[in-house]
A protein has these predicted regions:
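Helix-breaking motifs and short loop linkers at transmembrane-helix boundaries and internal kinks
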Residues: 53, 85, 106-111, 178, ...
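Conserved MFS/SLC helix-loop-helix module at the cytosolic interface between two early adjacent transmembrane helices
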Residues: 71-111
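Paired small-residue
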Residues: 111-123, 317-325
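Cytoplasmic helix-loop-helix junction between adjacent transmembrane helices
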Residues: 116-157
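Helix-loop-helix hairpin linking two adjacent transmembrane segments in secondary transporters
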Residues: 146, 153-200
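Transmembrane alpha-helices of Major Facilitator/SLC transporters
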Residues: 265-289, 299, 303
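C-terminal transmembrane helical hairpin of 12-TM major facilitator-type secondary transporters
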Residues: 291-337
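A late C-terminal transmembrane helix in Major Facilitator Superfamily
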Residues: 338-379
């Protein structure tokens, strides 16, 4: 065992390293669960619209309420893990996610949707930057000689892969189980409780520091990295903007324009787009950020063109093909942006820098869909 570790320094050769590697995958699982919860309502929006008599604009605003919470979480809490520790931030965030599920399950009115989505965003915002940094810490401790790109890739896949699972799981539960607006939340309450346990048994990677001691600035980049970070944030904005349109309006489009009545199918386009986005990062993640940016841009343009064709000549098949192509492109755009943003951060303020990066990305997820919904309602 010792010889194998010596021959391959990438293998964890101490109990501590093994513990950190186990924690790496446990925290990854917790991130996937919370991200999946964030997109849980995607196939349920038509049901909410029917129950509460909501227009597509009000549905989009309810969807975008998550962005307000996310930005608040990133702005006010996203940097705190650099000082308080990673687990001390992620565990309360998962508790907030459970509260959000309870609110959306037990408050059957539009204000309940808004409150639940805001709390969901608060949890997602806190975890987004903290978990990305936490995964990097854990993997570096487990495999000091390995590439730093791997944890960044895993974090990106966990975020987008988790987002893809939400519509699939909730759509299946709504389709084949009773109480479609309650059962999915019960399942995810249990899942998030499991996520809390997973984080609690993972090792902490930051020593808690008192607030009166000298502290690192919330946001500080390495020398010469400002333009690179700004560019990466802009790309993340565009990537999440595309996902936001699919997540907020995709189910209503499938129901109203393609005349599909099954909740499972309502969430399928979002699952395909986000799932393929995660797969594309695995398949092409070794490319340079420049290549990923170019390929991603082309795929997004092609994908949305196919979606438009599928709407003008109603075809669920074309819609799904377009969602897959566009999703692959959006995933590559996000991966290229994250690959530039992470190394641009000063080591002492990584969580704060990544919080700023995700703030821009999540604003992109909410703002374009809301503007599109208002523009559509104005034209119609």
């Amino acid at each position: 065992m010792t010889t194998a570790a010596a021959d391959n320094p990438g293998l964890p050769h101490t109990r501590s390293q093994a513990h950190h590697l186990t924690g790496f995958w446990l925290v990854t699982g917790a991130v996937v669960i919370l991200q999946a919860f964030a997109t849980l309502p995607t196939p349920l929006w038509p049901l909410y619209a029917q129950r509460d008599g909501l227009s597509s604009t009000l549905v989009t605003v309810a969807f975008a309420a998550i962005v307000v919470g996310t930005v608040a979480g990133l702005t006010f809490f996203g940097h705190l893990s650099d000082r308080l520790g990673r687990r001390r931030i992620i565990v309360p965030a998962l508790f907030v996610g459970i509260v959000a599920a309870v609110v959306m399950m037990t408050w059957p009115a539009y204000p309940g949707l808004l409150a639940g989505r805001f709390l969901t965003g608060l949890a997602v915002g806190v975890v987004a930057s903290t978990a990305t940094t936490y995964l990097s810490d854990l993997y570096r401790a487990a495999r000091p000689s390995s590439s730093t790109r791997f944890p960044s890739t895993v974090a990106s896949i966990a975020i987008l892969g988790g987002l893809s699972l939400g519509p699939l799981v909730s759509g299946a539960l709504a389709q084949w189980f009773t109480a479609p607006l309650i059962t999915p939340y019960l399942v995810f309450i249990v899942a998030m409780a499991v996520g809390i346990v997973a984080v609690l048994v993972s090792p902490e990677t930051v020593e808690r520091r008192a607030f009166h001691k000298e502290r690192a600035p919330r946001f500080r980049l390495r020398a010469g990295q400002r333009l690179a970070f700004i560019g990466a944030s802009a790309v993340a904005f565009c990537s999440f903007g595309g996902f936001g349109v699919l997540l907020s309006l995709g189910s209503l489009i499938v129901q109203n324009e393609l005349h599909v009545t099954a909740p499972f199918i309502w969430g399928l386009a979002s699952f395909v787009a986000l799932g393929v986005s995660a797969i594309s990062q695995v398949a092409l993640g070794a490319l340079s950020p420049r290549w990923m940016l170019g390929l991603g841009t082309g795929a997004v343009a092609a994908g949305f063109l196919v979606i438009i064709i599928g709407l003008f000549n109603p075809s669920m098949t074309l819609f799904l093909i377009g969602a897959a192509i566009g999703g692959a492109g959006l995933g590559l755009l996000f991966k290229s942006a994250l690959a530039v943003a992470v190394p641009a951060a000063d080591p002492a303020s990584r969580a704060g820098v990544i919080a700023r990066f995700y703030t821009t990305a999540y604003i992109g997820q909410g703002l374009p869909p809301v503007l599109l919904a208002f523009a559509t309602s104005f034209v119609s």
